[in-house]
């Protein structure tokens, strides 16, 4: 007989502390009762959760189910009704995503301490959980991640995958954990374990490439590094593994942030392979999962967004895979909004016709616990009071969310040492580790006539450059000229091709064709035919660049690196060690012909997964 996961969760909560209760004696109980149970660290976590839950009003419970972005700033109330003060003081919310650049670690730590202080002033004093999208690399997109700023700067996860070094991934995660902890961030809205089986998809830079086995191997170390020693605890940063059940196979490579990219498809009937990294994450102790916006088409599943889909969340994730942790939806499934000045409808794909109230009910019924990017607790209150959703069902999700706060130690010490933050974040050791990874992750695709490394350019050697500032060359005492006719070598840094999209938010997603247009190809060809040229192609997606490979003297691939890293590799200060984490297709025809859900399905690629040359030892 199949037992509902909701019942199992309540039974577990009621019985986990039984052993402790039996062992208790009366004097000990008297000492422990000096504080409310939920504030008393001598009680086990499940007893504290149960006690706090029993004290909460429906409105306070509803507030726990929402996870909203905020930026650094004052806590004063404002006329829009959505300030931090309103969300904490009136809407009872305690989960926030820090959605702004961090330019001063101490200042950010002080801001988060201020938020925690405000939370302690509420009736029950439930502490705040601060989360963040990735902020240790080069991506700058309010919807997906932030440039490192004051944090140590590493290659994107693709670059870590290119190095195929689980210990390095563990080291990165431990560094990121220390830097997050220093400012008060306790939740990482990553890793992204989608497989990059559709080369046009705009989210590939956040993946670990095309190989499910490699992704699984690396993700285990990633999660363990963020959690620290053992299970989730006071020195942990919890991770949110996404996007279940694997966001890679997007129809035509479009992204489901947007209405035209809402479909996810499996023409190769390869659903199971996309689940492999999630199974590895669960085995490694993942405590939170995020489904993607997409709706599956051409499958036996209902064609509705994954967070609305009970077959996905309850039957597959909780039932078949046995997950009993938190399911956090992706952002903005209920309410239409603006991101910047771009209007964004709620990503309620397949259930657009439902009201906001009905969408919230559908998400809870599917088995999700928390609504990302929303601040609508009044909907939950209405659903319970109307009898659509039981308060017992709300209690199950609230208990999961509270338990996580207790495990993280937030109830016992929500504050950080702000004065120490600047000494931890971006310290010399962490920065050097990131810089070394940037250099090592470079992949040498071609090296005709062994032009690289340019270890000792002769005095007076002149360079034509594109894609980076000449000041980096001047600092090395190299001469930069304005035309190829004057130069001895050309050094070019190019982003992987994409088709710009309209809208301030939409434009951040590199989408569409992976090939340079005819005009740009002709322009580059003139350079390649004029002088020896070294190209660095920045692979946030698998570029279609056979003409570059054929015509340039040497081609390097990178996955998030600064100009100093590029020049160190070019001039032999560092060696490229990376191997391609995906195939590089030969043509857009080949890309369009491949099945979105099958890895390594592109016909006759320019380079296969795993390609990467090495510098010869001189």
UniProtKB/Swiss-Prot annotation:
The signal sequence is 1-19
Entry keywords, A to Z? Carbohydrate metabolism, Cellulose degradation, Glycoprotein, Glycosidase, Hydrolase, Polysaccharide degradation, Secreted, Signal
What this protein catalyses is: Hydrolysis of terminal, non-reducing beta-D-glucosyl residues with release of beta-D-glucose
SUPFAM superfamilies recorded for this chain?
A: (Trans)glycosidases, Beta-D-glucan exohydrolase, C-terminal domain
Q: How does activity depend on temperature?
A: Optimum temperature is 52 degrees Celsius.
So which residues have sugars stuck on them? 40, 82, 104, 211, 263, 417, 448, 477, 482, 502, 517
Which Enzyme Commission number(s) are on file for it? Answer: 3.2.1.21
Name of this chain's protein: Beta-glucosidase C
| Organism domain of life | Eukaryota
Catalytic center at which residues? 330
Enumerate the InterPro entries for this protein. Cellulose_Degrad_GH3 (IPR051915), Glyco_hydro_3_C (IPR002772), Glyco_hydro_3_C_sf (IPR036881), Glyco_hydro_3_N (IPR001764), Glyco_hydro_3_N_sf (IPR036962), Glycoside_hydrolase_SF (IPR017853)
């Amino acid at each position: 007989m199949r037992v509902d996961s909701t019942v199992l969760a309540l039974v577990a909560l009621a019985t986990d502390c039984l052993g402790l209760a039996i062992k208790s004696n009366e004097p000990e109980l008297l000492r422990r009762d000096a504080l409310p149970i939920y504030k008393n660290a001598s009680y086990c976590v499940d007893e504290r959760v149960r006690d706090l839950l029993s004290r909460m009003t429906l409105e306070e419970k509803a507030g726990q189910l929402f996870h909203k972005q905020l930026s650094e700033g004052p806590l004063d109330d404002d006329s829009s009704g959505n300030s931090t003060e309103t969300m904490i003081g009136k809407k009872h919310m305690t989960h926030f995503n820090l959605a702004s650049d961090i330019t001063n670690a101490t200042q950010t730590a002080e801001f988060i301490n201020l938020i925690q202080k405000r939370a302690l002033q509420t009736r029950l004093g439930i502490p705040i959980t601060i989360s963040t999208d990735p902020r240790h690399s080069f991506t700058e997109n309010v919807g997906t991640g932030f440039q490192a700023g004051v944090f140590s700067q590493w290659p994107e996860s693709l670059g870590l995958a290119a190095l195929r070094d689980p210990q390095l991934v563990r080291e990165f995660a431990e560094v990121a954990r220390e830097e997050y902890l220093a400012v008060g961030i306790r939740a990482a809205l990553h890793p992204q374990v989608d497989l990059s089986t559709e080369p046009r998809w705009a989210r590939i830079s956040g993946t670990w490439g095309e190989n499910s086995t490699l992704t699984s191997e690396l993700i285990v170390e990633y999660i363990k590094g963020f959690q620290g020693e053992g299970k989730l605890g006071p020195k942990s940063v919890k991770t949110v593994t996404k996007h279940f059940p694997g966001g890679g196979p997007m129809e035509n490579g479009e992204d489901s942030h947007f209405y035209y990219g809402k479909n996810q498809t499996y023409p190769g009937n390869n659903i199971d392979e996309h689940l492999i990294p999630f199974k590895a994450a669960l085995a490694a102790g993942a405590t939170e999962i995020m489904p993607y916006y997409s709706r599956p088409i051409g499958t036996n599943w209902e064609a509705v967004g994954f967070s609305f889909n009970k077959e996905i969340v309850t039957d597959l994730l909780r039932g078949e895979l046995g997950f009993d942790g938190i399911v956090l939806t992706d952002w903005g499934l209920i309410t239409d909004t603006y991101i910047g000045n771009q209007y964004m409808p709620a990503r309620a794909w397949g259930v657009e016709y439902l009201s906001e109230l009905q969408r919230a009910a559908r998400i809870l019924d599917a088995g999700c616990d928390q609504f990302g990017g929303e601040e609508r607790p009044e909907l939950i209150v209405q659903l319970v009071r109307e009898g659509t959703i039981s308060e017992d069902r709300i209690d199950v999700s609230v208990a999961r969310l509270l338990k996580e706060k207790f495990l993280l130690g937030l109830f016992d010490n929500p504050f950080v040492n702000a004065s120490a933050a600047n000494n931890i974040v971006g310290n010399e050791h962490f920065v050097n580790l990131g810089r070394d990874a940037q250099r090592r992750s470079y992949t040498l695709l071609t090296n005709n006539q062994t032009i690289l490394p340019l270890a000792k350019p002769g005095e007076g050697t002149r360079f034509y450059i594109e894609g980076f500032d000449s000041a980096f060359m001047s600092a090395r005492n190299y001469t930069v000229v304005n035309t190829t006719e004057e130069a001895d070598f050309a050094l070019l840094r190019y982003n992987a091709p994409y088709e710009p999209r309209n809208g301030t938010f939409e434009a951040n997603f590199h989408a569409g064709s992976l090939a340079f247009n005819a005009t740009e190809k002709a322009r580059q060809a003139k350079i390649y035919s004029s002088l020896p040229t070294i190209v660095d192609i920045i692979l946030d997606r698998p570029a279609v660049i056979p003409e570059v490979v054929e015509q340039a003297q040497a081609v390097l691939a990178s996955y998030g690196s600064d100009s100093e890293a590029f020049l160190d590799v070019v001039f032999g200060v560092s060696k490229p060690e990376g191997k391609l984490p995906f195939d590089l297709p030969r043509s857009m025809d080949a890309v369009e012909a491949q099945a979105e859900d099958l890895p390594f399905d592109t016909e006759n690629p320019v380079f296969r997964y795993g390609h990467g040359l090495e510098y010869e030892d001189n």
